[in-house]
């Protein structure tokens, strides 16, 4: 497996771990006789663990190197993923998912840091967008595969498959990942706290992080709410749900593909602005349809395709713009970006889940609000 393929795969490790078992959420809730909100904690707390762990893996990779840190993280992910299949109750499943997330956090932060190690910002944005195009296959295929595995062998088998993927990535990383951090092993020029203060005092860095976090928050409101909206409210089957989710992921793939083709011509900031404009318009359309009483698969998936298309512009360009100016602390810069993006999304999704009322309105309104706020935040990038 070439290095680029592995980096693309591990960037999507979190998405794989979430999207693959989304069709199983209602069954897991029924199996353990618990509520939808409690079951959704297996998603939202996974996301929180994924976010927090990046603050550990990123700075550690700045000091010790990318390769060793990635191998350690993938080992944790593989073992915890398999353990999820054998839990006796919902609390144990939530705990195992948190540990799985701690390992998964090594993937995206190390992959982005490696790209920064190897390329300057404009080229890095193109590389990340290209990785995103391929990575978008994860949310397309994962729910479909998860739905099939669930139908054939039950939800525990979904986690065994995740553990198997982790083992493949671990063995591959051991063979193909070089050490790209030229500063690995050198004494730190300044303490981590001071380097963190440098990042948080950089207005453009904060603006890029805010845009990425807000747009991803809208996407995650769909990720956590879509199974209950589409299966619970609209009555689609778990298998059909997988194809609906895949249609949205196709929007993300298309956005990434277009970003690869035109991103270097227009620049990071212009692509960011365009992506947030598309996201805001799509979110407002979904909310308007929900509030006038239109409740159909098309009224959800159509606008969400557009939102995901805009997200495909935003994520690679926000990451390249945020991490690019900090070559000596690319791991920390990538970690803070990932932490804010994922923690904000988890908190947003938890808040949205509390307003579940058996309609599409809470989810649609949350997606619209995220798009509008991201558009507003993108204006700060232009002013700093």
Language model region names:
Residues 96-136:
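Cytoplasmic helix-loop-helix junction between adjacent transmembrane helices
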Residues 52-91:
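Conserved MFS/SLC helix-loop-helix module at the cytosolic interface between two early adjacent transmembrane helices
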Residues 68-82, 163, 271-286:
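Structural signature of the two symmetry-related core transmembrane helices
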Residues 92, 121-122, 129-175:
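Helix-loop-helix hairpin linking two adjacent transmembrane segments in secondary transporters
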């Amino acid at each position: 497996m070439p290095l680029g393929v592995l980096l693309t795969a591990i960037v999507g490790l979190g998405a794989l771990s979430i999207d693959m078992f989304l069709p199983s959420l209602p069954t897991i809730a029924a199996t353990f006789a618990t509520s939808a909100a409690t079951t959704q904690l297996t998603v939202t707390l996974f996301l929180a663990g994924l976010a927090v762990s990046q603050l550990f893996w990123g700075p550690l990779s700045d000091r010790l190197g990318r390769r060793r840190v990635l191998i350690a993280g993938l080992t944790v992910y593989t073992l915890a993923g398999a353990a999820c299949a054998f839990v006796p109750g919902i609390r144990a499943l939530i705990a195992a998912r948190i540990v799985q997330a701690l390992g998964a956090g090594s993937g995206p932060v190390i992959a982005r840091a490696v790209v920064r190690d190897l390329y300057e910002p404009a080229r890095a944005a193109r590389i990340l967008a290209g990785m995103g195009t391929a990575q978008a296959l994860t949310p397309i295929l994962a729910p479909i595969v998860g739905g099939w595995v669930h139908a054939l062998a039950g939800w525990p088998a979904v986690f065994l498959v995740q553990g198997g993927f982790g083992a493949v990535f671990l063995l591959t990383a051991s063979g193909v990942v070089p050490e790209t951090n030229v500063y690995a092993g050198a004494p730190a020029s300044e303490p981590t706290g001071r380097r963190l203060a440098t990042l948080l005092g950089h207005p453009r860095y904060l603006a890029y992080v805010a845009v990425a976090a807000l747009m991803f928050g809208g996407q995650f409101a769909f990720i956590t709410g879509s199974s209950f909206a589409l299966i619970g409210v609209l009555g689609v089957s778990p298998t059909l749900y997988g194809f609906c989710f895949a249609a949205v992921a196709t929007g993300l793939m298309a956005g990434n593909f277009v970003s690869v083709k035109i991103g270097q011509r227009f620049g990071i900031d212009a692509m960011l602005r365009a992506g947030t404009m598309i996201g805001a318009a799509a979110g407002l359309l979904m909310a308007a349809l929900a509030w006038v009483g239109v409740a159909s698969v098309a009224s959800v998936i159509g606008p969400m395709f557009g939102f995901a298309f805009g997200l495909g512009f935003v994520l690679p360009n926000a990451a390249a713009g945020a991490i690019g100016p900090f070559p000596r602390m690319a791991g920390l810069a990538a970690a803070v970006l990932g932490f804010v993006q994922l923690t904000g999304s988890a908190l947003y999704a938890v808040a949205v889940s509390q307003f579940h009322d058996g309609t599409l309105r809470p989810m649609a309104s949350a997606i619209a609000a995220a798009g509008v706020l991201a558009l507003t935040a993108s204006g700060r990038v232009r002013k700093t």
